[in-house]
Amino acid sequence: MGKYNLILSEYLSFVYNSQSAVQIPIYYSSNSELEKRCIEFHAKCVDSSKKGMSLKPLFEEYKDVIDNATLLSLLSYSYDKYNAVERKLVNYAKGKPLEADLTANELDYENNKITSELFQSAEEYTDSLMDPAILTSLSSNLNAVMFWLERHSNDVADANKIYKRRLDLFTIVASTINKYGVPRHNEKYRYEYEVMKDKPYYLVTWANSSIEMLMSVFSHEDYLIAKELIILSYSNRSTLAKLVSSPMSILVALIDINGTFITNEELELEFSDKYVKAIVPDQIFDELQEMIDNMRKAGLVDIPKMIQEWLVDCSLEKFTLMSKIYSWSFHVGFRKQKMIDAALDQLKTEYTEDVDSEMYNEYTMLIRDEIVKMLEVPVKHDDHLLRDSELAGLLSMSSASNGESRQLKFGRKTIFSTKKNMHVMDDIAHGRYTPGVIPSVSVDKPIPLGRRDVPGRRTRIIFILPYEYFIAQHAVVEKMLSYAKHTREYAEFYSQSNQLLSYGDVTRFLSSNSMVLYTDVSQWDSSQHNTQPFRKGIIMGLDILSNMTNDPKVVQTLNLYKQTQINLMDSYVQIPDGNVIKKIQYGAVASGEKQTKAANSIANLALIKTVLSRIANKYSFITKIIRVDGDDNYAVLQFNTDVTKQMVQDVSNDVRYIYSRMNAKVKALVSTVGIEIAKRYIAGGKIFFRAGINLLNNEKRGQSTQWDQAAILYSNYIVNKLRGFETDREFILTKIIQMTSVAITGSLRLFPSERVLTTNSTFKVFDSEDFIIEYGTTDDEVYIQRTFMSLSNQKSGIADEIASSQTFKNYVNKLSDQLLVSKNVIVSKGIAVTEKAKLNSYAPVYLEKRRAQISALLTMLQKPVSFKSNKITINDILRDIKPFFVTSEANLSIQYRKFMPTLPDNVQYVIQCIGSRTYQIEDSGSKSSISKLISKYSVYKPSIEELYKVISLREQEIQLYLVSLGVPPVDAGTYVGSRIYSQDKYKILESYVYNLLSINYGCYQLFDFNSPDLEKLIRIPFKGKIPAVTFILHLYAKLEIINYAIKNGTWISLFCNYPKSEMIKLWKKMWNITALRSPYTNANFFQD
């Protein structure tokens, strides 16, 4: 089997290297004869090891097991106390330890002082500013590096260069840590005061980042970048990432476009051989020079030198180095500040009376008009979502914090919880539930705060508002978003598009007579000057809308929404500062409202329109596109003459002056060839993404387990790899080995094998081959998948107790009664299941389920029990199909040019042969008629799983289902009797299968699955009309071909002669596919 098991075995010998250590392999087989031998083999191994005998003779005797059975897990057994890390580390600590510059950062606590200098006592101490927030320890990370170094110490040629580079960097890390001793973590993977008091406060998070960086070093340039970042980030914990990545916003404006991709009328990318010259005024070069000087002032040498050298000819070929530096800068780790500083940062802005009130006025009116435009149609038509807004809000109520911990009673059980959903249930049960009253957030009841940490930026605060705010805003915001969905200005929400579409939009209109203006408005969004005009614009819009309807329910919805805006104009926040909780009047907009994203986009669109209308007073141009995307906005302006240096400089200065008239602290730039925004940047006509996801430090602690985090780690590694930042795969696998191991007792540990972690079961963590999702079809794979399915659904006593309490039942019944016109088991059960699932975020429930799962897993990893299941997985379907396919060699030539230079070669090759796609494949069922019919009459949104179940019911039952959701019997009858219904069956099945096959994740989201080049490699004779079967055969063939091409860099063609008799069987099976959720699929989802 694969490389993983080999690494696993070597890693165990490396870690448990004493005389007493034993490794016992555990095998399994789906063949009952061989399975008996497996069990015998295991028993004898355990026996021999107890007697201290060698296992070698057994390996000979049971060669049949080792050759033919599948490795299930490794049992490792060692008496040794585990201080091996320190012993091994000494051998690498040959260098000079780093000394922190204690004046490098403005805020005292951001300096890397000895912990006891920052915190006098254990009571004062907090780890929140340096907590790696990941369920793996520094000692494990050190072990993983030393294991890699030992394994590769005899490498030759180029591999030896990599070894030497990494060894050199690790010497810095090892020497520094060795000086203070390795900090020991507690059972929650946190570092306590006792451990940290005599060590530098940021030692752990710095070491994690450094290890992540040094294990991503391959070339000499990587080495120089990493060395500089590792050394400087030891002292500079505040501005380093920002300094290093700042120049990028200008660099993108310096490269000529010589051939690019543009979006055509069909929303596809097509190549255009246009040439656009980069026109750069001297002023811009001066600004860039200033940035480079700032880097040098901060002690950087090699990185500014690389940028300076690139500036000589600004070539696109060498730009990959610039994009590398930009990505690397994020890997210095998160900047975590104290809440008080994060909050005051936004309040420090000087308020000046000297602002252009006319512009503010225009800005407010634009916001008002946009709100009206977005909501006009639903309001005039008395849309049911706006009428039943409260119910809609309750159905999608999150289980996030409600800001305070309360004591709640569920039946006989008393619970302390902060969760919104639980508070709602409790309030309803005690008659305290008043959604018509929006609680005040003024000085008597200040808002508690959450935080958001990002590398290279300051910490931002998040409002944790009472659930009434969510209910009041939910329905209206949903309507705003569905408007934004078909409005191209809103790049983030535009229907099923992905970032490639936005890229083609920009390049499409670039030419010698256009310039593109791009602005980062993140400062503006959270500035005080924004809040009054912003909220007032929304309020004025809502007032106009209220006059467009006579429906009291719609008016009520709009009024409650308006009330949230009024309350938030006078908001106070509570900030813990040491032991006191400070109340501060906070006059700015913060995240945390349901409307945050939508409203910010509206405001940013209004802002750029205001700016453009001022510019239009002075210049004559046509605005070709305006886009807002999160905190950024950009516009392409077309002039009637060719653009000159002087023009670019004038427009640039005018734009900046206009922003300053509104006292908006934004970074506005003008270029003729490229843009840089938070999500992506375009340079030389190509698109780039920042590969800045931290692997060994996390932003915050959630309730994910080690297995989940191992899957997230792998998923982050894959995303970075696609974006051009590659970490050594062996290192990632070693981390997975560490994070998925399960302790049985102090000296006994169980390590799952590759088969367990890569089969798509409920325990899947990674793919055996990067970018390729395999669906095992061999006997052993299907066997293990069945086994795991049997133990995935663990019960939780606490959850059952809550769910059987009157409080919970009443709540679910209340929702069902409000929602349903007539009783319907499917829907009621659906609601109950959803509500019960929300309890999972309550820690005790989660832990209980997890414990049960781990103990079941432990049993299973030692001796799998065969399990007869009537559940069918996607693997079963593919297994039925596979035998009918015949493979032959084929040839596809490269015919598309590169547009995403950072892609790994094998993925790039596939795209160049079959092309890319600019849209998301619909995998939610929302495009089906039944889904549209339901949303026309009801606020209920069935999941793809539920639609898939419903659509395969008998027609009578489908009709009842629809009627119970408020669809008029006539419409329901018409639907079931029409052709649309049979089309829907196909549509929903298609969506469901796409969803199961993760077609919108990983690198599959980049490939054009409908490529004619791909189609011509597949030959399937047409027999009978079962479109669903044809669909699955084709999709299987496409995935097979693409996976083969990614792996081997060559093409195959497939012929399938599927017997007609089997088709009906397959079709029936296809209506019983069970969806599998695993840490792996959750991690994919988490990436979204």
UniProtKB/Swiss-Prot annotation:
Where is the chain membrane-spanning? none
Instruction: Please identify the protein, giving its name as recorded.
Output: RNA-directed RNA polymerase
- Quaternary structure and partners: Interacts with VP3 (Potential). Interacts with VP2; this interaction activates VP1. Interacts with NSP5; this interaction is probably necessary for the formation of functional virus factories. Interacts with NSP2; this interaction is weak.
So what does this one do? Answer: RNA-directed RNA polymerase that is involved in both transcription and genome replication. Together with VP3 capping enzyme, forms an enzyme complex positioned near the channels situated at each of the five-fold vertices of the core. Following infection, the outermost layer of the virus is lost, leaving a double-layered particle (DLP) made up of the core and VP6 shell. VP1 then catalyzes the transcription of fully conservative plus-strand genomic RNAs that are extruded through the DLP's channels into the cytoplasm where they function as mRNAs for translation of viral proteins.
Q: Which UniProt keywords apply?
A: Magnesium, Nucleotide-binding, Nucleotidyltransferase, RNA-binding, RNA-directed RNA polymerase, Transferase, Viral RNA replication, Virion
**What family does this belong to?**
Belongs to the reoviridae RNA-directed RNA polymerase family.
Pfam families (UniProt xref)? RdRP_4, Rotavirus_VP1
Q: What is its EC number?
A: 2.7.7.48
Source organism of this protein record: Rotavirus A (strain RVA/Human/United Kingdom/ST3/1975/G4P2A[6]) (RV-A)
- GO CC terms of this entry: virion component
Chain ranges of the RdRp catalytic domain: 501-687
Indicate the enzyme's highest-level EC class: transferase
InterPro entries, from UniProt? DNA/RNA_pol_sf, RNA-dir_pol_4-hel_dom, RNA-dir_pol_luteovirus, RNA-dir_pol_reovirus, Rotavirus_VP1_C
Entry cofactors: Mg(2+)
Reaction catalyzed: RNA(n) + a ribonucleoside 5'-triphosphate = RNA(n+1) + diphosphate
Q: Where in the cell is it found?
A: Virion
Q: Does the keyword Magnesium apply?
A: yes
Any single biological process term in GO: DNA-templated transcription
Q: Which GO-annotated molecular functions does the record name?
A: nucleotide binding; RNA binding; RNA-directed RNA polymerase activity
